[in-house]
Each structure stands twice: as C-alpha cells, then as structure tokens.
Amino acid sequence: MTPRYFKEYLARYTYAKDGSWCYEDGCVYRGLALLHDQQPQEIWRDELLRLIGPQVGEDGALAGYTQDEFNIDHILAGRVLFFLEKPAPGAHWSLAIEHLAGQLTRHPRTDGGNYWHKKRYPQQVWLDGLYMGLPFQIEYGLSRNRPDLVDDALAQLNRALDLTHVAATGLYAHAIDEARAQDWADPQTGLSRAHWARALGWLAMALVDVTGLIGPEKAASSGLPERASALLTRIAALARPQSGLWLQVIDQPELSGNYEESSASAMFAYALMKAARLGLGHQFAAPGLKALASLETTQLYAGDDGIVRLQNVCEMAGLGGFGSRLRDGSPAYYLSEPLRPDDHKGTGALMMAYAERLASASAEARRAAS
C-alpha cells in the first residue's frame, strides 16, 4: 500500500512554495533519492527529475532563491544535487551546488561559531537548521576535497548539542538564542521551553546521516555515535506503548490535546532503523520498524474525498514572530499549530523511513549470506 500511496501522492504533487526552491520540496526529493537507491527499477528518479528540473536553470540558478536571504532551510534540498550529479553529471547540477555552498561561505554565524538559523533570526541556532545545512556542507566537503568544511560542520554540530542539551529531560531544546534577547528564550540559558517532536526528529536524522557520511573512523573521533545513541535511547523510551509513535510535545503525555504526530514519528523511525544498520545499537531496529508499520496502518487513510493521505502532520511550528503570531515555544503553542494531511515534511520523511526499511533488510540479508 505504501508505494502506491507514494505514486498517487506524486501524481497530484503540488510544490510547497509555488515552485520556488525550498526545504519542504527538499524533504520529498531526499525521500525519492533514497527510494531510488533501494528500488532503481522504479519511477522514483524519473519523478525526482520531473519535479526538480524546472527549479534548476542551465546556469545553476535556483527558482526564487537568493543567497543574501541567508536562510539555512534553503540548503537542504541541495543534498539531492549530489545524488543527481553522480550518475549523469550535468553542469547545472554542479553550478547549483556551488550557489548553495557560496551561501554557506558568507552565512552569518553566532558569536560561538554556528550558523544563524536565518538572517531574520540573529544569534539563534535551531535544531531544524542542523539538518538543513550541516549534512550538505559535509557532502560538499567530501566531494570537493575540503576536509576543513567537514571539520567545521562537525564542530558546529557538537557545539549545538552542547548548547541545547537539557540534562533534566535527556533531550534537546528546540533552539537557543545566544543573545538572550528573544521573548521565548530563558534569560539565563537562552533555551526555548518545550520539546517539540519534529525538532528532535530533524536532529536525530542529522546525527545518523552525518555518522553515515563521515565513516566509522571519523565518526568515532567526533563523538557523534555516542551522542546519537544516547538521544535515540531516550527517544525510543518515549514512544507511546501501544502505537509506537511519538507525541507532538514528546515528553508530556498528560498534556491535554497532545497527539501522535506523523512527521516526527517517521523521522524517528528512519533514524532508529538507520542507527541500527550503522552499528550504533541493534536495539534501535525494533522501535523503528514498529513506528513505520504503525504509520502505515493507522495514519495512511482516506478522507471524505476518498483519497488516501498521511494524516496528523503538523504543518509548521517555530519560534518568535511570524506574521501576526508570536510563537512563544510553550507546550500550548506547539499544540495550537494546524494539522495538514500530506504535508511535504511528513510524506518526505515517510519515504525516507520506507527506504531505510528496505536498506536495512538488504544489509541484514547480506550479513546472513556472508
């Protein structure tokens, strides 16, 4: 049922930002690339080319994108450009990569050395941004023989983990304001208040992706495997006992109105299964598999129009002013954000998790045969 859902979703696909380059489409693109790696005979790469083709000009210009916006979110979709560059090199893919890498060379940094989340969010580091920017920088550094960029990305990731870790919960805050200037930031620590599941999902995926990219030796020296294992152990413990999914405000099951959120659950499923495949802990496979199966059986269903969609996906959440809203980072705030079936972030993450289940099964079959 799940591959059929993906194909029907792609057939009715609408760009997240009217065709402008953005991370939301990038989540789906990343999912398609991973699906192609496991099922090269399928339509996934053709669909990716159909969707991304109109967004990348012959000169590498990206639709609606400007470097000087300094939005770290815009970097994420660039990861798929490395995938497209490998089997069929095209100058425009490489030129587009350079446009995005050029942003990072000039992107503002906090006083501590981390990328600002966005130009309009000065001195702020969000967990979301760790996934949006740092794996791309590592892939760029590895493919362009720039070990300095790999080391810088690893230093940023470890520094962000140090800054956002909350010892009392064993989790990480959604964001830190190093300037201690934002209303949502604790005046002493600079941290936001509540633990939003999808923010932790972005982080979990960043940790396993980076660990996989840099290889066992460098991963061991970076300390990331231990940090990933500690986080995923805590995440696995917070899964709801019956469904195996995770709550929007992940550590507050008693909170009225809290609900099982699909995008974060798919991200955790992906991260847990990949962690097991990478050798970070065999115990992570079972909760990852359970979560994906639960998403497939309980969150993929038809609405009144008869179309099967991924349900219970939080459309967006953030911190600080956004239009007329003041997003204060409280548990109540995260529960106030609307749900959007088939949101790109949810379906993209589900594609990643489904592909990872295939990758993990293939790896296990190879081990059994050896």
Task: Annotate the PLM regions.
Residues 9-19, 160-163, 169-177, 182-192, ...:
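His/Met- and acidic-residue-enriched segments that coordinate or traffic transition-metal cofactors
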Residues 1-26, 33-34, 38, 43-45, ...:
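CBM-like carbohydrate-recognition segments
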Residues 114-121, 175-180, 246-254:
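Short linear capping/connector segments at secondary-structure termini
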Residues 1-17, 46-63, 95-114, 147-173, ...:
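Long, well-ordered core segments of solenoidal/helical folds
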Residues 39, 88, 140-151, 210-222, ...:
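Inter-helical turn/loop segments and adjacent helix faces that build the functional surface
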Residues 204-253, 257:
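Oxyanion-binding "anion nests"
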Residues 128-143:
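Acidic/serine-rich, low-complexity amphipathic helices located in mid- to C-terminal regulatory regions
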